[in-house]
A protein has these predicted regions:
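RNase H-like nuclease module associated with reverse transcription
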Residues: 12-13, 52-166
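RNase H-like nuclease fold core
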Residues: 8, 13-59
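Amphipathic alpha-helical
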Residues: 1-5
Length: 166
């Protein structure tokens, strides 16, 4: 019996879930970013980290998390291509904040805060270059939710069940 797969995978999908918990740290006021990246159905990257600057809005926290997710998508595409895996479809990044989704998908949107404006242009550049595609997802279905805030046992069990069976 041969345990080594004999088929080469022609192409893999990249799916990234990102979330933020605004002003999670009560001492510093910094938000927390959570990201889980899947190549195919396998989680290959996950991280929960405190954001480096204080955001004054939930939108700012979520958009900062989206920018980090785009950086992960770009890196994963590079690594996979360097191993000879074809990547022709954009990486899908799932966000649960409707305002972030609408602004990231709208090239006519403008942001006033300079740091967010730069993050916006970074995200938009990769959307227009067909490197990433932003998708909206319900908060209950966002795998990264468990990396940003404590969940009750039922929510955690449901999320882990979905995570392990998909």
């Amino acid at each position: 019996m041969n345990s080594v797969p004999n088929k080469k995978v022609k192409e893999l999908d990249i799916n990234i879930f990102c979330d933020a918990d605004h002003a999670h740290d009560l001492v510093t006021g910094r938000s927390v970013t959570g990201i889980i990246a899947f190549v195919g159905s396998t989680p290959v990257y996950w991280k929960s980290t405190r954001q480096t600057s204080v955001q004054t809005s939930t939108f700012g926290s979520e958009f900062t998390a989206l920018k980090k997710a785009v950086e992960v998508a770009v890196s994963l595409r590079y690594y996979l291509r360097s191993m000879g895996v074809q990547i022709s479809k954009p990486a899908k990044i799932y966000v649960d904040n409707k305002s972030v989704f609408l602004n990231a998908a709208n090239p006519a949107s403008s942001l006033n805060k300079k740091a967010l404006a730069l993050a916006y242009h970074f995200v938009r550049e990769h959307v227009s270059g067909n490197v990433i595609e932003i998708q909206h997802i319900r908060s209950e279905d966002n795998y990264a939710d468990c990396l940003t805030k404590p969940l009750n046992s039922t929510m955690l069990r449901n999320l882990l069940y979905e995570f392990m069976t998909n």
